[in-house]
């Protein structure tokens, strides 16, 4: 596969995972400073790594969220918390992932991710139900 084919495949995968709105916004904001970087992201991250057959996208989403949570990369984490539903991740899986990460990435990072996930859920209209504290 040549670079142009990999770029096209990357755009397709990137759109399937992150959504058309996000990818279109990135493409509309291309300029002479960021174009090479955006092309690299589409070609390498999405056309090469996310396109590999070894892990299903569902698993890739969970791994990505865990790594971003551990590294404290909040902008990317928010984006992938939003996008993971396109890959079949459930709210319960996210809850367990964040809880599990608290053991290895620390409580502050997981606490921030938990709040961020709740904000994303609210934005998507899937806010968790209130529970009775009794």
Swiss-Prot record:
Pathway of action: Aromatic compound metabolism; beta-ketoadipate pathway; 5-oxo-4,5-dihydro-2-furylacetate from 3-carboxy-cis,cis-muconate: step 2/2
Catalytic activity from the UniProt record: (R)-2-(carboxymethyl)-5-oxo-2,5-dihydro-2-furoate + H(+) = (4,5-dihydro-5-oxofuran-2-yl)-acetate + CO2
Keywords of this entry: Aromatic hydrocarbons catabolism, Decarboxylase, Lyase
Record GO biological process: beta-ketoadipate pathway
Highest taxon of source: Bacteria
Keyword Transport: no
One MF annotation (Gene Ontology) recorded for this entry: peroxiredoxin activity
Coiled coil: none
Keyword Nucleotide-binding part of the UniProt annotation: no
Enzyme class: lyase
This enzyme's EC code(s): 4.1.1.44
Pfam families (alphabetical): CMD
Family classification: Belongs to the carboxymuconolactone decarboxylase family.
NCBIfam families the UniProt entry points to: decarb_PcaC (TIGR02425)
Protein name listed in UniProt: 4-carboxymuconolactone decarboxylase
Organism listed in the record: Acinetobacter baylyi (strain ATCC 33305 / BD413 / ADP1)
């Amino acid at each position: 596969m040549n670079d142009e084919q990999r770029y096209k495949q990357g755009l397709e995968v990137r759109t399937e995972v992150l959504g058309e709105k996000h990818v279109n916004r990135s493409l509309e904001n291309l300029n002479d400073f960021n174009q090479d970087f955006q092309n690299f992201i589409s070609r390498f991250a999405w056309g090469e790594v996310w396109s590999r057959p070894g892990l299903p996208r569902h698993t890739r989403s969970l791994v990505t969220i865990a790594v971003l949570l551990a590294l404290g990369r909040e902008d990317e984490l928010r984006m992938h918390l939003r996008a993971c539903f396109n890959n079949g991740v459930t709210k319960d899986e996210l809850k367990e992932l964040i809880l599990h990460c608290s053991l290895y990435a620390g409580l502050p990072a997981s606490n921030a991710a938990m709040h961020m996930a709740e904000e994303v859920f609210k934005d998507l209209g899937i806010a968790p139900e209130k529970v009775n504290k009794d």
